[in-house]
Amino acid sequence: MKKQGIFNSQISYFVASMGHKDMLSIVDMGYPIPKDATFVDLVFDKGIPNFIDTIKMVLYELEVEKVIIAGEMEVNNLKNYQKVIDIFSNIEIEKKSHEEFKDIAKNSKFFIRTGECTPFSNIILVSGVIF
């Protein structure tokens, strides 16, 4: 049995398969995941699991060189915005409009849907390299 890290076998597999510049999107409950996209639906209930905890677990195993968020998060969800800023204090944070974000996210290798129920709690993690 695995001792630590991500225990969800699908997420563990997808994270392990990420290459440099591949994108992974972590999204809220209401996000319109593209029809043909690969995704893992983690929603148990409203708020479970939440957006920030999901990011932290993925970061336990994924090297990230840049993140992309919707600029609307700063105005409409200051609490999660500030947490994202804190978590990624040493990483480039690119802000796009929500519509631009959705267009970029379509290129994600996979999506993780969380139980988050606050507006604009969506992020694209761009995979880095460990060397």
Swiss-Prot record:
Catalytic activity: beta-D-ribopyranose = beta-D-ribofuranose
Any one GO molecular function term: D-ribose pyranase activity
Gene3D superfamilies: RbsD-like domain (3.40.1650.10)
Coiled coil: none
Residue numbers binding substrate: 28, 98, 120-122
UniProt KW keywords: Carbohydrate metabolism, Cytoplasm, Isomerase
Gene Ontology biological process terms in this record: D-ribose catabolic process
Function: Catalyzes the interconversion of beta-pyran and beta-furan forms of D-ribose.
Keyword Transmembrane: no
InterPro entries named in the record: D-ribose_pyranase, RbsD-like_sf, RbsD_FucU
Subcellular localization(s) per the UniProt record: Cytoplasm
Pathway: Carbohydrate metabolism; D-ribose degradation; D-ribose 5-phosphate from beta-D-ribopyranose: step 1/2
The protein's enzyme class: isomerase
Gene: rbsD
SUPFAM superfamilies hit by this protein: RbsD-like
Similarity comment text for this entry: Belongs to the RbsD / FucU family. RbsD subfamily.
Residues forming the catalytic site: 20
Major localization listed first in the record, in broad terms: cytoplasm
EC number: 5.4.99.62
Superkingdom: Bacteria
Entry keyword Electron transport: no
GO cellular component: cytosol
Stated name of the protein: D-ribose pyranase
